[in-house]
Amino acid sequence: MVRWHPAALAVVIAIGLVACGSGDKSGTEGGARGSRRFGTIASPCGPGRASGATQLGVTDSTITIGFGDDSAAASSPGLNVEMSEAIRAMIDWCNEQGGIEGRRLVGDEHDAAINDVETAMRSACARDFMLVGQGWLLDDAQERTRLACSLATVPTFAVSERFATAPLMVQPSPDPPESVNAAGAFLLAAAYPTKVRRAATMQGNQPTARAETARVVGAFEQAGWQFLPCEQEYNIGGEANWVPFVQRLKDCGAEVVHFSGSMRPTFEEILRAARAIGFDPIWMQEASVYDSDLAAWNSEGLADNVHFQMTYYPFEQADRVPAVADYLDIMRAAGAPAGLLGAQAVAAFLLWAEGAKACGSDLTSDCVMRVLKNVSNYDAGGLQSPTNPGANLPGNCAMVLRVRGTRYEQVLPSDIAIQACDRTYRVSVGR
């Protein structure tokens, strides 16, 4: 391990002095136009006099960071490619301003194609200073290699419990197994106190899906939800007929259903089956709904009762949230697609860049990790609601969106572009 340099201990970084609202757009010039701000925070990028080949991937003039996705997977072409597109765009955005303390950023892309994550990690270990904004589905398989080469990372997300609680890792939107931001569950319980006492779950027949459902139930029960004994488990590869599943939910008296699984075709077929038997519960989905084509698909109104929690501000609120406007401007200038995972990758990049800037000429991965472990209140300039990356804890703020026609709209809280915050919204669950 590289030793921590004492000079960096004196650095105090103010990352995201935040409130639960979206902030004022005044003073933001737009990220794509070379502005020195991103949302409510000063850009961490710019000229400087940092120098020294302090670690693999660092020279007097450059910093090489790895990033990547699973987009070459034969089973899911293009999987999560928006993360890599976002990191490339942010590298260009940062270099246009002078890099990090004068060092130009060099991107090194690694495509794990789902099953080749260990190969991708070996490649990163051989060349990169740190991994930034990557996300691989089988991240459990990377950890022996990553930790053996002491490769620190600020990923977009963590899938496995092993990686989500690993050393040498800080992420902008922590999701550790024992702590849940259940703000959406609390908000729905306040809005529909009777309905949430007749809730049910539906998930695929995989151990990870069962574990996640148990985690959801444990968290939501603390928000006042009560779950009926009619959990539905389906074949992850699909079912020939979805009517029996939704019929059992209807017969059980479920008024709210928490669904976990793929959007297309699984959830769309379930919604169609529910319409066929006149079953219209509140569906509670995951935030990944926002990145799907569900709203565009919903021309018949089958998804009009689908709700989901968001801790990132939706793109429809760009006129009210400066960070969202800046993110969209940067992606547009780069010709890159905008997406929820892309926004989360940008949050990871900005968090990493703050740490790298703080270290200056003493740039090592230990230095960056030490700086980031002291970040307890981070909102990526208002792109998301506040989290505690240093302690690996999620936030306690969120909004609830729903599908209405072919659009997404905020329904809770009623004040648009405001997230509801309460310390009780973050709950502990058993592992």
Language model features by range: what are they?
Residues 174-175, 273-346, 414-429:
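Extracellular/periplasmic periplasmic-binding protein-like sensory domains
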Residues 16-19:
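C-terminal motif of bacterial Sec signal peptides marking the signal peptidase cleavage site
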Residues 27-124, 260, 341:
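N-terminal extracellular/periplasmic Venus flytrap/periplasmic-binding protein-like
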Residues 34-52, 56, 376-431:
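Solvent-exposed, acidic/polar segments of extracytosolic/periplasmic ligand-binding ectodomains
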